[in-house]
């Protein structure tokens, strides 16, 4: 086994993202005026006392209704990569790749973006602070590295098959420059709610969202699980059997695949690993 009997590769790319980033635009300053809302209600025939009582409840709705949201596609992402490929003395093919993006756009938590438009009314509803009439960009650029290695081995005449192919892969994704979760949070599906907020605001927001529904889970996801972490890793495995000329010249390749995201949450959109996620799949190619 000659360690230099190996193919090496290096590459560089500058590309534009095809994955959409969710961003927001704050309502105009006039939408935040409680006095203006009361005046508008009175002008439409609502008694002053009633209008003043309704204003605190209606004002967040007015602000949300005058805000806007959009998707954007960040440009000029730099990608540097190194790779190798060799064959071990056992006949096992071994390959690996290291990629580095010094300015990768990472999606901020979309729930924080949504509620940031309300922070001029209540600064505790989001860890992101919004400004009336200004954009709330949905991403920040971070250093993202991806390291993966793959082993492939062939076995002939196994289980009645001409060949059995086993493939195993391990991947690791470190992210540099992440802020503490009290300053900025990345990733996590919005269906899990806002996460921890000052003054128990997470429970308050969940209670409002679930108004009229069961209230027993309002604090269940007021935690930091699910947000992008500095490290994440997992592994994949696949087995493929090759049966030639099974009938009428048809070749069949049944396969089974297994994946396990062991620890951490990768940056999005489209992160590779979500801690605890497991999947198995069966298939047949002909």
Question: Where in this protein do the model-derived segments appear?
Answer:
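Residues on the lipid-exposed face of transmembrane beta-strands in outer-membrane beta-barrel proteins
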Residues: 1, 10, 82-86, 96, ...
């Amino acid at each position: 086994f000659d360690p230099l009997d190996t193919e090496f590769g290096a590459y560089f790319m500058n590309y534009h993202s095809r994955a959409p980033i969710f961003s927001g635009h704050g309502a105009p300053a006039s939408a935040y005026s409680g006095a203006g809302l009361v005046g508008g209600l009175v002008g439409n025939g609502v008694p002053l006392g009633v209008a003043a009582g309704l204003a605190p409840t209606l004002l967040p709705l007015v602000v949300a209704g005058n805000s806007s949201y959009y998707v954007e596609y960040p440009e000029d992402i730099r990608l540097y990569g190194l790779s190798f490929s060799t064959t071990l003395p056992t006949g096992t093919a071994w390959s690996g790749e290291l990629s580095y993006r010094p300015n990768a756009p990472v999606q901020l938590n979309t729930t924080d973006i949504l509620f940031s438009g309300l922070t001029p009314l209540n600064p505790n509803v989001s860890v992101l602070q919004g400004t009336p009439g200004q954009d709330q960009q949905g991403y920040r650029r971070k250093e993202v590295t991806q390291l993966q290695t793959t082993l492939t081995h062939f076995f002939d005449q196994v289980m009645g098959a001409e060949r059995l192919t086993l493939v195993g892969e391990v991947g690791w994704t470190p992210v540099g420059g992440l802020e503490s979760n009290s300053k900025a949070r990345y990733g996590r599906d919005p269906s899990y709610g806002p996460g921890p907020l000052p003054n128990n605001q997470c429970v308050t927001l969940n209670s409002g969202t679930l108004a009229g529904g069961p209230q027993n889970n309002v604090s269940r996801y007021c935690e930091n699980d699910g947000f992008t972490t500095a490290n994440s890793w997992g592994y994949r495995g696949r087995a493929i059997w090759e049966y030639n000329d099974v009938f009428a010249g048809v070749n069949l390749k049944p396969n089974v695949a297994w994946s396990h995201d062991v620890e951490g949450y990768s940056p999005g959109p489209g992160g590779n690993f979500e801690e605890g996620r497991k999947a198995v799949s069966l298939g047949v190619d002909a």
